Amino acid sequence: MASDPMSVNSSAREPPAPPGSGADEPKYGGYTRFELELEFVQALGNPLYLNHLASRKLLSNPAFIAYLDYLQYWSRPPYLKYITYPGPTLKNLELLQQEKFRQDIISPDLVERLRLEGMKAGIDWHRESFPSTA
């Protein structure tokens, strides 16, 4: 099943062409590989989703770990600009490269800490970007 965008062999593939590059990407269920991989990599910004992946034992699957390594292309231009929340998304993608983190994310305490850190970062960013006039 080498044509599957998330197959074991996907880690050896080149990243998909970004929109507007003129490349004619095949569709999988109506979506391009670019769209599917963008949706998935953005989901990695959610600590609860990472915990779900760990509970399903995906974070100990060598093929899945290779896929996470492959997805690091999202941290570089021209792909970076398409990520809605690059801070938590890329932080978690980087952390997922570490075996210890992949093991530890099963802990509800770590999930809650990451969730609270993300909320605090969002609040701090909002305060810096839109200071009150009072």
Swiss-Prot record:
GO terms for biological process: regulation of transcription by RNA polymerase II. It is found in: Nucleus. Residues 1-12 have a biased composition (Polar residues). Keywords: Activator, Nucleus, Transcription, Transcription regulation. Residues 1-28 are annotated as: Disordered. Pfam families: Med31. GO terms for cellular component: core mediator complex; mediator complex. Its main location: nucleus. GO terms for molecular function: transcription coregulator activity. It comes from the Eukaryota. Component of the Mediator complex, a coactivator involved in the regulated transcription of nearly all RNA polymerase II-dependent genes. Mediator functions as a bridge to convey information from gene-specific regulatory proteins to the basal RNA polymerase II transcription machinery. Mediator is recruited to promoters by direct interactions with regulatory proteins and serves as a scaffold for the assembly of a functional preinitiation complex with RNA polymerase II and the general transcription factors. Belongs to the Mediator complex subunit 31 family. Component of the Mediator complex. This is Mediator of RNA polymerase II transcription subunit 31. It comes from Neurospora crassa (strain ATCC 24698 / 74-OR23-1A / CBS 708.71 / DSM 1257 / FGSC 987). The lineage of its organism: Eukaryota, Fungi, Dikarya, Ascomycota, Pezizomycotina. The gene is soh1.
